[in-house]
A protein has these predicted regions:
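N-terminal export/membrane-targeting signals
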Residues: 1-20
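Carbohydrate-interacting regions of secretory-pathway proteins
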Residues: 18-217
Length: 217
């Protein structure tokens, strides 16, 4: 057999497998738009509290320092999201605490009053762990580990919020009028708004990357 023909016969199936794998990787990402370029904080705005707590390093948003919040302020949906799927990859260092806010708005200081927080906390002392809807539908134990990248997904459609960690549903909640446990948090209402990443305290180090969103109708 011609050696070139033999090589072609061996390589062709591998090429097909590679193409199928590539299609598989893209399949779940259709309609998603990147919110972070991996190089800068373009499209994002750090509030005035402690802006040095949030930087870009080695392709990641690195949170390390006193309390601050990084708000998405870019062009996608004019940074005003109602129904969406948000995905990000997150890595926590030991005893770190953070959060991903949604349906929120820029605030110069303090923790955002508007919107909800999806908790990021694997081993911090707070019993409210990663994958929970903070103080609304909490999770314990944590479904992820420190020093390992994990996949975070937040889906909001109508009055329903679903949170997944590494593809597994960890929290599901449907908003109802006058929920008793929300009376002390009047800003915890579904409506629309932007996203924010939290620097919780000086001892918390968290990395975020591959942040993207799929607006839903």
């Amino acid at each position: 057999m011609n050696k070139f023909l033999l090589v072609a016969m061996l390589v062709a199936p591998l090429a097909v497998i590679g193409a199928d794998e590539a299609k598989g990787k893209k399949k779940g990402e259709k309609g998603f738009i990147s919110l972070f370029d991996g190089k800068s904080l373009d499209g994002w705005k750090v509030n005035k509290e402690n802006p040095k707590s949030i930087v870009v390093k080695d392709g990641n948003i690195v949170i390390d320092g006193p309390r601050a919040h990084l708000f998405y302020d870019g062009e996608v949906e004019n940074h005003n999201f109602k129904n969406f799927v948000l995905r990000a990859e997150v890595m926590t260092k030991p005893s770190a605490n953070s959060g991903i806010y949604f349906h929120t708005k820029h605030q110069d200081s303090g923790r955002p009053d508007a919107g909800f927080e999806a908790q990021v906390n694997n081993t911090h002392g707070d019993p409210k762990k990663t994958g929970g809807l903070y103080a609304v539908k909490d999770v314990n134990p944590a479904p992820a580990k420190d020093n390992e990248w994990f996949k975070y997904e937040i889906r909001v459609k109508g009055k329903k919020i679903n949170i997944k960690i590494n593809g597994k549903l960890t929290s599901s909640w449907t908003e109802v009028p006058n929920a008793p446990h929300l009376k002390s948090m009047p800003g915890r209402k579904l409506g629309s708004g932007t996203f924010a990443l939290q620097a919780h305290d000086p001892k918390s180090v968290i990395h975020y990357r591959n942040i993207r969103v799929k607006p839903l109708k």
